[in-house]
């Protein structure tokens, strides 16, 4: 009887070790698949009014994450939107000078400075960063400097990351 009990115990322990190893390997593969930079189209009411394309990035590195907007990319999108606005509204240099600007370029420069601050700088200042963990299809974010934790189910299909709770769909860019 004692041999049977020992075999059972050994079998149970080996079984548990196999299950733990499979879970560890599965999560390890998922971690590697998750690491990189992901992007999705981001918008604000102001950006929609201006018809400017914004992109939010989600960067995942070894144990760390951060959300951010690229300043230079946003700058290029804003300048393109300003050009379209001036063309579509048929605004002249005289119209801009009458509004208190020195020139169309001066107007764009002032708008750009303000918009970059209000869109990109404010966003990046408030965007989350911290550590992360995954466990069997659940992604846990732990934000730096706070006790806030955010948990969501996720899946990755064909370089697309689906964060279920928010309904976010991100595409891998790096």
Residue ranges of model-derived segments:
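Conserved glycine-centered beta-strand/turn positions repeated across beta-sheet architectures
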Residues: 35-37, 67, 152, 163
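Short, exposed beta-strand-loop hairpins at the edges of beta-sheets
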Residues: 144, 151-166
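Membrane-interface motif at the C-terminal end of an N-terminal transmembrane signal
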Residues: 20-32
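Tryptophan-anchored aromatic micro-motifs
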Residues: 30-49
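N-terminal glycine/threonine-rich, aromatic-flanked beta-hairpin/loop signature
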Residues: 49-140, 144-153
């Amino acid at each position: 009887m004692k041999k049977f009990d020992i075999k059972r115990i050994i079998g149970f322990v080996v079984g548990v070790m196999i299950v733990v190893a499979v879970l560890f390997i599965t999560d390890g593969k998922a971690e590697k698949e998750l690491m990189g930079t992901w992007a999705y189209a981001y918008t604000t009411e102001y950006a929609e009014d201006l018809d400017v394309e914004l992109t939010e990035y989600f960067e995942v590195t070894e144990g760390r994450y951060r959300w951010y907007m690229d300043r230079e990319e946003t700058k290029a999108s804003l300048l393109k939107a300003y050009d379209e606005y001036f063309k579509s509204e048929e605004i002249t240099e005289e119209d801009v000078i009458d509004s208190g600007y020195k020139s169309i370029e001066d107007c764009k420069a002032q708008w750009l400075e303000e918009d970059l601050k209000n869109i990109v700088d404010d966003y990046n200042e408030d965007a989350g960063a911290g550590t992360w963990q995954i466990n069997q299809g659940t992604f846990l974010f732990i934000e730096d400097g706070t006790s806030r934790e955010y948990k969501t189910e996720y899946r990755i299909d064909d370089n697309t990351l689906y964060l279920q709770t928010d309904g976010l769909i991100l595409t891998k860019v790096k």
